[in-house]
Amino acid sequence: MKDYLEIVDVVARQILDSRCFPTVEVEIYLEDGTIGRAAVPSGASTGMYEAVELRDGDKDKFLGKGVLNAIRNVNEIIAEELIGCNVFEQTYIDKMLIELDGTNNKSKLGANAILGVSLAVANAAANSLDMPLYRYIGGVNSKVLPVPMMNILNGGSHADNSVDLQEFMIMPAGAPTFSEALRMCAEVYHTLKKILNDKGYSTGIGDEGGFAPNLKSNQEALDVIIEAIGKAGYKAGEEIFIAIDAASSEYYKDGKYVLEHEGRTLTSAEMVDFFEDWVNKYPIISIEDGMAEEDWEGWKLITERLGKKVQLVGDDLFVTNTERLEKGIDLGVANSILIKLNQIGTLTETLNAIEMANRAGYTAVVSHRSGETEDTTIADLVVAVNAGQIKTGAPARSERVAKYNQLLRIEEELNDVAEYRGRKAFFNIK
């Protein structure tokens, strides 16, 4: 097997993401003619500790959202250092990119510039070996297909409606295979659309493909999902479970949780009561960002109360950052980390975060962003690290479906070796 192949050219360009904003795409050219390509996603609700996404700020072009400065950083600064490097030295290249930037949040070159290069390098290396990306990243034991954490109802900053919480999702943990899990989700999605139509609600969709109706309350979102699961022919709490992304940092103001659409302002303890009440009433298996990113005491409380029976995912809390994750582990908060490549900015740092989480007994959920492209790297990544869970939107909008379709291909390729862990993917809760 090859172990040395030089990078001969690096090209970055500005393309559009699924929200019609510019993003960075990078191509890496190798001496044998191989090309590797990667496109970078972008978030709507972002944690304050995320690596910095470099935007131009020129209001005359793309409302200030252009990424030409990030493109220039790749084509001029990064390319000069990268050309001549061995494409198989991923760790060395990522370290070089971090040092070239020189800041603790990648604000000089931009995490979008750095991530585009990091992922394109990995894709180029895999392509040169004629090897699937998941196999190149993860090795021979990469075989676990993920349980989808599928967004079917949107609220918060992902939709323009009356729901405070950001995402209501379904997880087919009772399915026997990934392909069956996807079918179950698709059927619930279509059933939910009919239910919403029959109730006179809009079936317009949000950034991630979930429906965004003007429901009367946050709880009504759970009720219509339970109805959809049943009418689709499945048992809630046995075959299909509910997951929530509360994105609570978005409505955390002056130390309180302000649920504007419900006209309620809650303390941390009351917010935990709010979720505990839901967990007792509904088959909720996972809550993401139930507490705000700076509410460490709230996180301690929700972990003490719910951490043995519900997956508590830190997204804004951890931002795929090993320093934040280490603090959380030391404090005993949450029991899972959401993995978003662009929160930290390189493949190596992402893999380090997953490894740290696994060592501490935390689950890892590999995730998309609300602004996505047709890039399917995260589908390969989730299999590469045997994470067992993926969050990549509804079975609608092609930038979301692209990831699911790639996972179907991987499942087919792995054939009898493919493993769908279902309920066992939640190994640290009862």
UniProtKB/Swiss-Prot annotation:
Binding residues for Mg(2+): D245, E288, D315
Gene3D superfamilies: Enolase-like C-terminal domain (3.20.20.120), Enolase-like, N-terminal domain (3.30.390.10)
Annotated Gene Ontology cellular component terms: cell surface; extracellular region; phosphopyruvate hydratase complex
UniProt entry tagged with the keyword Nucleus: no
Disulfide partners: none
UniProt subcellular location: Cytoplasm; Secreted; Cell surface
One Pfam family linked to the record: Enolase_C
Catalytic activity: (2R)-2-phosphoglycerate = phosphoenolpyruvate + H2O
EC number: 4.2.1.11
Cofactor: Mg(2+)
SUPFAM superfamilies per the UniProt record, alphabetical: Enolase C-terminal domain-like (SSF51604), Enolase N-terminal domain-like (SSF54826)
SMART domains named in the record: Enolase_C, Enolase_N
The keyword Metal-binding is annotated on this UniProt entry: yes
Active site: E208, K340
Family: Belongs to the enolase family.
HAMAP family attached to this UniProt entry: Enolase
Protein name, per record: Enolase
Organism: Clostridium beijerinckii (strain ATCC 51743 / NCIMB 8052) (Clostridium acetobutylicum)
